Design a protein with these regions (language model features):
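Conserved beta-hairpin
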Residues: 1, 142-159, 176-179
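Conserved N-terminal entry element of GNAT/NAT acetyltransferase domains
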Residues: 1-8, 14-16, 78-97, 239-245
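Short amphipathic alpha-helix that is part of the acyltransferase structural core
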Residues: 18-27, 87-124, 245
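Acyl-donor-binding surface of acyltransferase catalytic domains
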Residues: 25-97, 230-235
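Conserved acetyl-CoA-binding loop-helix of GNAT-fold acetyltransferases
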Residues: 28-38, 172-175, 181-194, 198, ...
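Conserved GNAT acetyl-CoA-binding A-motif
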Residues: 42-54, 167, 196-208
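A short helix-loop-beta-strand connector motif used in the catalytic cores of GNAT acetyltransferases and
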Residues: 44-46, 70, 125, 135-146, ...
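Conserved active-site alpha-helix within GNAT-family acetyltransferase domains
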Residues: 55-69, 182, 186, 198, ...
Length: 245
């Protein structure tokens, strides 16, 4: 028995109400692809996620078997971490009382993600996914959540996860639409990097959508540089199950 080709995603399956798994390899040949498909059918999988390297042979093999390309992913990295500066007065760590406001922002801030780009997923559930995501992040799933406060309310967030060894990743970034273009993103980033600089972290990475030029520009302005590209595919086995209503 070699390494498993797929892993079932219990949380995703419960949330969306369909059986979801993720492929482990990032490159496949014809035989490996067919073994993955056989496993999914035997396990009753409805949807398979596949994060593929930007490899022509892998892409062709997947697309020949009805894998749908739902996102082109860009990875960006910051290394070394710049010296910490004092956080802005409006920037602080998230607290319980911020969650309601952050959930509202999250529901409308991530429409470029692969879930919205797959019509099998109901858009209302996608909105709820990001509400839950920021909620869980504030409850400890993320190692740190930075917020900017204006007029007594949190109007933006940025989540940070510590990775081993000596690395961190930035997850979600969102700003209330009525407060955009006011420098809030820069304050969030400064607050995040100030916290990260005290955590023995040597590099920070993030991933965003290739079509999301604004997001890439935000990170590049902070000193991040592109380091890799990959492609998210979804393969549905039961098109009518979990389809958006």
């Amino acid at each position: 028995q070699g390494a498993p080709l797929c892993e079932r995603l219990d949380w995703d399956s419960r949330f969306f109400g369909v059986s979801i798994a993720r492929a482990v390899p990032s490159r496949v040949d014809l035989l490996t692809r067919d073994a993955i498909l056989d496993w999914c059918r035997a396990q009753g999988i409805d949807c398979l996620y596949f994060l593929a390297d930007e490899d022509a042979d892998t892409m062709r093999v997947l697309e020949d078997a009805a894998f749908s390309r739902v996102d082109d992913r860009v990875t960006l990295e910051l290394q070394p971490i710049p010296p910490a500066s004092s956080p802005h007065a409006d920037t602080r760590a998230a607290c319980q009382s911020d969650i309601a406001a952050l959930r509202k922002i999250a529901a409308v801030s991530h429409h470029d993600s692969r879930f919205y780009n797959d019509r099998h997923f109901d858009r209302g559930r996608c909105d709820e996914l990001y509400r839950v995501w920021i909620d869980r992040s504030c409850q400890g799933w993320a190692d740190h959540v930075v917020v900017v406060e204006r007029d007594g309310n949190a109007v933006g967030y940025l989540t940070v996860h510590l990775r081993e060894p000596h690395a961190a990743s930035i997850g979600l970034v969102g700003v209330d639409r009525t407060y955009r273009r006011q420098g809030i993103g820069a304050h969030l980033m400064d607050g995040a990097l100030a916290w990260i600089s005290g955590q023995s972290v040597r590099r920070v990475w993030t991933a965003t959508q290739r079509r999301n030029v604004a997001s890439q520009g935000f990170f590049q302005k902070a000193g991040f540089r592109p380091t890799g590209r990959a492609i998210w595919y979804h393969r549905w086995f039961s098109p009518s199950t979990g389809a958006a209503s």
